[in-house]
Swiss-Prot record:
Highest taxon listed in the record's lineage: Eukaryota
Protein name, per record: Nuclear hormone receptor family nhr-176
InterPro entries hit by this protein: NHR-like_dom_sf, Nucl_hrmn_rcpt_lig-bd, Znf_hrmn_rcpt, Znf_NHR/GATA
Disruption phenotype: RNAi-mediated knockdown results in reduced egg-laying in the presence of the xenobiotic thiabendazole (TBZ). Not affected by 5-hydroxythiabendazole. Reduced expression of cytochrome P450 cyp-35d1; expression reduced further in the presence of thiabendazole.
Organism encoding this protein: Caenorhabditis elegans
Amino acid sequence: MTKKSTIQPCLVCGQSSNSILFGAPSCRACGEFFRRKVISNFKIKNNCLGECSFAKKSMKPCQSCRFQKCLEAGMLEKMVFSRKAIYSISNFEKSILEELEEAYSKLEHGRNETFNPKSDSNPKFCSHEELNNTCTIDIQIILDNLISYFQAKKPMGKEQDDVLKMHFIVPFVLFDTAFRAIGKSSYISPDGTMFGGSYVEKLYQDSSNSKIGVNNGKTSREIMESYWKVSYKILKSEMELLQLDRSEFLLLSALIYWDFGLENQSDKCCENCNTIREKVLKELVKYERKKSGQNALRIAMIMGLLQAVPKALDVMKTCGFLSKIYNLRGSGCPLYAISTNSPPQ
């Protein structure tokens, strides 16, 4: 890392850059492209003759040529999983968005290391037992990688940190699950299996592992299917209409964590949350201005998604209540326990 701030071109696309990403001077867009391709471990198909031009801004290079250009620029795949993978050349403090990107990348890496999801042309659908087990493990991964970042960024004291944590976990899981399912016909579990969406019946289907005394899959599906459809419409459909991107998703996630007016939240914690929320909002405005020019309507529509999260949470709480009352399949979901302020068993 040099001490003097330097502006130099991205060695991949030629745009101005002041960052070293994965070992090479690169703009954030090319660095994020390289990171996604390495983490996905998906073989990029070469559909051209390797003649894509990076000089013509009007022509977008294919993924194969762009990835090869990243390697030629000096980007290293091993650095994607290194703590030193991304750093700024300048002395300026990292933006909250950059920190969120690093924290979420660690979360994704933790999921890949734990679940080892595989790309399959014939994806597997999970049962409610499998989904509950995966969710329990994933919550710990979220705690270790994302929530730990929030708590280190702005410590509030153990009691208030716990208040923010307990009010964040379930909304974030719902928000994250919907975001990762954009463009797909169903939700994707962190282990790569599918559930919900157009295939609710598969989640509650009878299996040899079903517990005795629990209502059959047909009954569970008939009661719960309408709630799945409502939840699908509240969050996932709205995200798809807005074409929410990763940076917008991360900044909104930060606003969900640093919320205010929560039960058992102290006045000081509310004040601190409002202070850091202002910084997050400024970064969102800056990001949208850079992405497509000043667009107040776009920002307003994106912020509207925050109003959808409590609605999705209410639907999930109703599902939890009905599951217990009617002894339905899936009643052991850890999100139900957390949403009623009880720790998951």
